[in-house]
Amino acid sequence: MSRKPPLSAPPPRGRKRTLLIGVVVVALLAIAGAISGLVIVTRLETGEWKVPDPGEIERIVKIAPRQPARTIFLERRPLELRPGTDDSSKGVSSVLASVRAKAAKPAPVKAGTVAKPQADPRRPVKLPGWKGTDKGWNQVVSCVAKLFAPFDVTVTDKPPADLDNIVLVAVGGRPVDLGVSDRRVGGLAPFHGGVIASPVVFVFAAQLGNDVRTVCETVGMEVAHAYGLDHGFLCSDVMTYLKPCGTKKFVDKDVRCGELAARNCEGGEPTQNSYKRLLQVLGPRPAKPAR
């Protein structure tokens, strides 16, 4: 507990304006410091993983912290989304905005040629939705619900009555549908190491062969990124890039973060416990009342 410094005499009138300007500048710097990048994270088809190249990493400006979404909505139907700051209730995606921003960078033009006109980066995108079987879809929903069963969050494929601050998971299609040319990408999510309000995440089920377990675990990873979880360097954890690992879950163990090599986690922490981190963010699932 620190002592309060002694009160100083009021500054002269001319100094008040200087001090006020200084306070405003400091406040703006504090706000700027609170703004962090959202790193798009990718998962590769049929369980194959790779570390994103520096050129594949996009950073999107967003202010945190936010309250965690209590509903994970798995959307199997065709879906239209627009680029912008994440707002799942309105179908607005920061990931799409980042992809569009990258595509809008002018390409080098050879002498004597005319540059191609750029498409409107604000245009919406239409995703095809789930093209697997109904049985496979029901298995995906059950699998995702089991992954998040320990936590106080609802997993559903029925449109929620209240769309405010849900995790919208667009399931289906391929990365090219979003404008991503790398066919190895299986999922995309916004990430900055903290909770993202009303996020939209993507799981390219067709690129993953509509394989139930792979789609399920990809959903788990991408949703967990929106709750602030980093990649974990543990083969049995949902957050891993490692393979082959068999069936994965959120593991109650302190592990190093990393993709193909161990590293510190986002924010500088040496380890991450994916199970306890989700418990911290969402809380435990309430016990069912006794009959």
Give the ranges of each region predicted by the language model.
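Metzincin-family zinc-dependent endopeptidase catalytic domain
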Residues: 77, 131-234, 244-247
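Hydrophobic single-pass membrane-insertion segments
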Residues: 32-48
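Short hydrophobic beta-strand segments
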Residues: 69-82, 168-169
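Short amphipathic alpha-helices and their capping/turn segments at secondary-structure boundaries
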Residues: 54-72
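Zn2+-dependent metallopeptidase catalytic core
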Residues: 59-64, 77-163
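N-terminal Sec-pathway targeting helices
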Residues: 12-29
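Juxtamembrane low-complexity tails/linkers enriched in Ser/Thr-Pro and polybasic
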Residues: 2-15
